[in-house]
């Protein structure tokens, strides 16, 4: 059921007051894809009275006051994305459209929404209940961080928002514990997965360089970020604190990851999977076209790409739902009156991480000295695609389901490492679960740029492309990489797709026979990337990939990512050496234009 958004709904529920009021920068969509809805439904399922105020008018009290004041706390989120990312392009132009706003116009979410909403509440409720910040905007800005839009180091968002608590990461457990302890009159400052402000430093926590120090010294900023990044795994992380003037930001160790059973329970909650009627009157919400008939199979990501925030926010450990949980949800989708038989996506951050576990990580936490997929797939990971193969086969058997597409994209290096199931997974995918285009994200081909991104070298892409085309077009595999300059070929992975897999895929080619294509995603102007690198990519794309790429984005330095650290410091954190960083907006655009244009200039 929908959570109430108006006084009329409270009256209908015979509620005089709410325990928790959640405020968000997106339209209210009751869906498991929307973080504030998940938090709301988790709290409601635990017996708390929860309401939602979506995209309140920041120039009056009409919206922010319409549900009154909560008994326990206010929860504040900027929405599914950082509000500055949602509102501006990588070249700092205002975005005109918004997929998460009714009507599609980007005119309802303020810049720095978390700070604005928190101060809006303080304006109209002077001595109110605790303000709890959450969501990706708060999570990635919880310590001193580089802010691309102001080109400055900003202090923890807790200080600017004048809030009481911040919950970081996927915060169901922490938020529920806050509600329970506030209800019972208990202290909340010992809860894992939260940050708060203290007049004194805690004992036995690691001290980060002070805010004032990291503003003045890039080496201190790098030291701060490295320590912060290495203390995010629930099994190994220590508590942290950072001085901001006379006060201290305190970060408690993270909450344990949800178990698969706990994740199943969340997706079994009573989501309506639609826009709340109050917001439907304001127009269509474009995001519904994608999320309404899609399935999330897992959380977390093994990739740890330097430009991406998923590993920090969702975790570097993949937690997969049970097949039964996913099938149950798919059966619910099939019963919806507007379901046409097509599940638009079955996946997560990367579709083919479902069901793949690292036993070491489950018991000892994420490694401090290496990554799961970079520079090669770790031997401890033991990729096994059999769980997803079985899941996809089960989805096809559901009454009313015509197709279940895998649109999230896949990691071809992870597939390459699964010698036992590589062939059968590709056959399953191509024959039944690709809508015409399969997404992959090599991001670049220049060796140095890929290294700074934390992405695999290009040989894995070439191997994968050959096999995909052999299946779908009957092309002969190419034994040589044509059109690749020495810098691109240098340090390429020497791993090959297993020969047994290649033979099997060739055998299945005629039975599949579908005309399908690979869609490639690339990034321009990442730290370390030059115009010459983009010309190299342009040449490679035309000669080897046989495409003129259109899916190209200019790099945006997201708060609390290693790529953002490189952008600010102009230093490679792995070597300590200075790197080239393009910061001129016109030249960033030129890097993109080089590859999307029809000629190399």
Segments predicted by a language model, with ranges:
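Terminal amphipathic helices with adjacent charged low-complexity linkers/tails
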Residues: 59, 188-220, 225-232, 246, ...
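Conserved, mostly hydrophobic/aromatic
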Residues: 164, 266, 301, 326, ...
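Conserved SAM/AdoMet-binding glycine-rich loop
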Residues: 22, 38, 57-58, 332-476, ...
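Intrinsic disorder/low-complexity segments
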Residues: 201-203, 476-512
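Glycine-rich beta-alpha loop elements in corrinoid/cobalamin-binding modules
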Residues: 35, 54-244, 249-252, 256, ...
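Radical SAM enzyme core and accessory elements
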Residues: 2-5, 215-255, 262, 268, ...
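N-terminal pre-triad scaffold of radical SAM enzymes
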Residues: 23-28, 282-309, 340-342
């Amino acid at each position: 059921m929908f959570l109430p958004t108006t006084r009329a709904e409270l009256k209908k529920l015979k509620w005089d007051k709410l325990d928790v009021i959640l405020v968000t920068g997106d339209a209210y969509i009751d869906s498991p894809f929307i973080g504030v809805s998940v938090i709301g439904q988790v709290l409601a399922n635990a017996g708390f009275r929860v309401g939602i105020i979506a995209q309140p008018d920041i120039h009056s009290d009409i919206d922010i006051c319409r549900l009154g004041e909560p008994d326990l706390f206010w929860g504040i989120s900027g929405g599914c994305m950082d509000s500055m990312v949602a509102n501006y392009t990588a070249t700092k132009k205002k975005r005109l459209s918004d997929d998460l706003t009714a009507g599609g116009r980007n005119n309802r979410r303020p810049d720095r929404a978390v700070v604005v909403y928190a101060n809006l509440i303080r304006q109209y409720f002077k001595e109110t209940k605790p303000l709890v910040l959450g969501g990706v905007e708060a999570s990635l800005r919880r310590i001193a961080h580089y802010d691309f839009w102001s080109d400055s180091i900003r202090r923890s968002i807790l200080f600017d928002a004048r809030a009481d608590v911040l919950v970081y990461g996927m915060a169901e457990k922490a938020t529920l514990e806050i509600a329970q302890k506030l209800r019972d009159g208990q202290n909340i400052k010992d809860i894992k997965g939260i940050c708060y402000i203290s007049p004194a430093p805690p004992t036995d926590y690691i001290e980060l360089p002070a805010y004032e120090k990291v503003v003045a010294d890039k080496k201190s900023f790098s030291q701060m970020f490295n320590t912060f990044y290495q203390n995010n795994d629930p099994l190994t992380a220590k508590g942290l604190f950072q001085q901001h003037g006379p006060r201290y930001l305190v970060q408690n160790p993270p909450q344990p990851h949800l178990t698969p059973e706990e994740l199943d329970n969340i997706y079994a909650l009573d989501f309506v999977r639609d826009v709340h009627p109050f917001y439907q009157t304001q127009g269509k919400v474009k995001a519904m076209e994608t999320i309404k008939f899609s399935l999330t199979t897992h959380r977390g990501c093994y990739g740890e790409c330097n430009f991406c925030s998923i590993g920090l926010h969702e975790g570097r450990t993949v937690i997969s739902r049970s097949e039964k949980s996913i099938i149950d949800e798919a059966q619910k989708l099939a019963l919806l009156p507007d379901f046409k038989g097509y599940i638009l996506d079955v996946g997560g951050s990367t579709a083919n991480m479902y069901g793949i576990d690292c036993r070491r990580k489950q018991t000892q936490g994420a490694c401090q000295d290496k990554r799961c997929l970079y520079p090669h797939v770790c031997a401890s990971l033991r990729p096994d695609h059999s769980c997803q193969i079985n899941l996809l086969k089960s989805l096809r058997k559901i009454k009313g389901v015509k197709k279940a597409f895998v649109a999230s994209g896949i990691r071809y290096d992870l597939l390459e490492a699964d010698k036992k199931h590589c062939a059968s997974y590709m056959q399953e995918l191509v024959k039944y679960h690709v809508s015409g285009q399969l997404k992959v994200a090599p991001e670049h081909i220049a060796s140095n740029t890929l290294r700074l991104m934390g992405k695999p070298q290009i040989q894995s892409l070439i191997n994968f492309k050959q096999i995909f085309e052999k299946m779908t077009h009957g092309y002969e595999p190419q034994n040589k990489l044509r059109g690749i300059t020495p810098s691109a070929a240098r340090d390429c992975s020497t791993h090959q797709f297993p020969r047994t897999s290649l033979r099997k895929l060739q055998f299945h080619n005629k039975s599949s026979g579908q005309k399908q294509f690979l869609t490639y995603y690339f990034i321009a102007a990442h730290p370390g990337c030059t115009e010459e690198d983009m010309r190299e990519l342009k040449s490679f794309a035309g000669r080897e990939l046989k495409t003129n790429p259109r899916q190209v984005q200019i790099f945006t330095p997201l708060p609390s990512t290693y790529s953002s650290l490189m952008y600010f410091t102009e230093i490679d954190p792995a070597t300590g050496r200075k790197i080239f960083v393009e910061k001129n907006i016109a030249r960033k655009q030129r890097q993109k234009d080089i590859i999307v244009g029809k000629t190399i200039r």
